[in-house]
Amino acid sequence: MSRVSQTFALSTAALLLMGSLSACSTPPTPDATAQALAQGLGSLDFSAVPLADQDAASISAELTTALEPMIKTPRTVSLESVEVDEASEKPKTATASYKITWDLDSSDVDWSYTTTAALVFDDESKTWQARLDPSVAVPGLEKDQYIAKKSVAATRGDIRGNKDQALVIKRDVLNIGLDKASSTEAEWESSAKALAKLLDIEADPLVQRVAAAGPRAFVQAITLRNDQTQTIPQEKFDQIPGVLVQHDAVPLAPTRSFARPIIGSFGEATAEIVEASKGTVKAGDKIGLSGLQKEYQDTLAGTPGYTISIFDKDKKPVERLLENAPVDGKDLQITLDRDTQMLAESILEETTSDSALVAVRPSDGAILAAASGPSTNPANTALLGKYAPGSTFKVVTALAMLRNGDTPKSVVNCPATVSVDGKEFKNYDGYPTSALGKIPLSEALAHSCNTVFIEGALKAKSPALAEAATALGLNVDPATGAASFIGAVPNDSTGTELGANGIGQGVVQSSTLGMATVAASVANGATVTPYLVADPKPAAPVAAKKPLTAQEAKDLASMMAEVVDHGTLKDLNKIGGKPVIGKSGTAEYDAERNAHAWTIVTQGDLAVAVFVSDGSGGAQTAGPIAKKFLTEHK
C-alpha cells in the first residue's frame, strides 16, 4: 500500500489555486480543502491545510501522540465524498468523509474505517477551512487519548506421545528473581548474592545483570518447576530483600532431562533469532529454541491475535476498536512412550561415556525410546551419533551371505586370522577355540567370528553388502520427522576396506537408531522404517530394490537366537517372557584398541539397540544394559 501520492498533492495545490482565482466570481467548492486534509491525515502534517481557528503544529503534535504506538504501521487515507449542507447559511458548512486503511500485518486482512471532518466557509478569506478534533483520525478518539495494538497470544499446542500420553504440556513453574523496585539500591548487590547462594547458582552474572537493569526492573535469576523437585521453602525467599517469586505455567516435559536432545527447549527468543526473523519474531516472544520445539514451531505456536483499543492518559482501555482472535497451535503427536523413555534414561545414568539406547516397535517402526546418556547432553547421540557398529553389523553381512547362497547351516571356515591385501585380521581376544575351523554359519554369528564375515563380505562384494543394509533399513535416508541419521554403507569398497566393513568397522557408520532398525526389521520379517513424528507422519524413503523377505528374516532371527542361547549374549537367555534374540558388537576406534560397545536385541514387539562409546566389549558393557532394560520394561 502507498500513502497519498505526489500526483494527488499536486492536484490538491492546483485546486487550491483555482479556488482562489475564482473566488471573486463563483464561491469555491470545499473539494480542495477536503483533499488537502486527506494529505494531512496521511502525513500528519497539516501545514498546507486551511484550518479554522486552529494551529497546524498543535494539531500535528496532538494526533502524532494519539497514533504514536502505531505510527510505523502503514496506512492510507482517501477522500470518499464531500457534501455541502445546503441548508446552512453563514457560515456555510460541509462534511468530508475519508476512508482510512491500516496494513496491520503480512496477511490480506486490513483495518479500514470511515471518518468525517467538518468544513466551514470563511467569508473573510473566501476559503473553506477544516475544523479538526482527534476523532477525524479515529472515530471515538478524544483529547488526551491514544490507540494501541496489543498482541493476544495463541495457546501453544502440546507434544503428545504413545497412546496420546501428555509429554510436553503447560506445567507450573516459579520465576524467581530480584524486584529492584521493592528494595533499596543499597540492598541490590547483597540481595543478588544471597539469592544466588540460596539457588546454588553463580553470583557474579546475577549481580552484573541486576546492576545493569533499570531501577524498577525485575531481574529473573532462575525458573524452577513448582513440584516435588522444588525444595526451597517460601520463607527463605522472603528473608532476602527484594526477592520476588512469580507463579507461571510453561510448556515442559515430565522431567528436565526427558528426551531433551530430541524435544528441545522453549523460551524467550534471543537477539540473534529476533534479528534473523525479519520482523516475524519480536523481542520478548517465547518460541521453540531447539529440537522438535523449534522444528515444529509454526505447528505448535499457532497464530497470535491482536486487539486495537483506545486508551486514556492513565493507560486504561476505553473502547475496543478491533479484535482479531488468535488461532491456537496444534498438538504434535510423536511416538515416544513416557515410561519406556524414562526407563532408558534412568539405566543410562550409570554410564560414564557417551551412550544411547533406542527402542523401536517392529510392527510399525514407532520409536518408543531414544535416550542419550548424561555425558552426551545436550548431544543427540541416540538419533544423530555416527559410529562404527562393530559386530552388530554382522547381521547385515550375514544377510549378504544368505543372498550369496549360504544358509544358517552352511559350513564356513573360521580361522584364527585372515590376511587381506597384506593386512592381517584376527578374532577378538578370548574367542573360543572350540568355535574355530569348520563351523555352521549360525555358530559363526553366535560366537562372532571375524574371519568368517570378512571373507563373506569379500565374496558378496560391496554392492551386495550395501543392498543388504538397505533391506534391513540401515542404508537409507531418515524419515523420522526429526533430525536423525540412520546409517551409511558404501557400495564401492574393495579389499581391506571391504573386509573391515564386513565386521562393522572400515567406513560403515550407524547411529543407535540405525542398529535398532536392523533388529526391528529382523523381528518384523520385513524392512522397518522408523519414525518419531506420528502426525503428520513423514513419507517413507524409497524402498529397497531387493527388500527383506520373510524367509531371510526368519533365517537371521534363528541365528540371532543362538547368540543369546549359547553365544556372546548368553547372559540374556534367562530373561522371562517371549524369546530374546540379539547380537553384540565391539568396534575399536584407535591404535590403543579403545572400543565402542554395542548390543542389539529383540523381544516380542520390541527392538532395542544399546551403544556405549567407551566399553570393554559389546557383551560385557552394552549387554548388561540391554538385559536390565528388557527385564524392567513392562
Predicted regions and their residues:
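Gly/Ser-rich catalytic serine loop of serine hydrolases
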Residues: R156, L384-F393
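Short, gly/Ser/Thr-rich active-site loops of penicillin-recognizing serine hydrolases
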Residues: I625-K634
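Second-shell loop/turn segments in exported
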Residues: A36, A52, D103-S106, Y146-K150, ...
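Short solvent-exposed beta->alpha transition segments
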Residues: T29-Q35, F46-T95
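Beta-lactam-recognizing serine transpeptidase/beta-lactamase-like catalytic domain environment
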Residues: D312-L321, D354-K386, A400-D614, G618
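Short, low-complexity, disordered segments immediately C-terminal to signal peptides
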Residues: L16, S25-Q39
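Extracytoplasmic/periplasmic proteins that interact with beta-lactams or build/remodel peptidoglycan
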Residues: R75-E80, K90-D354
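Secretory targeting and sorting signals
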Residues: M1-T26
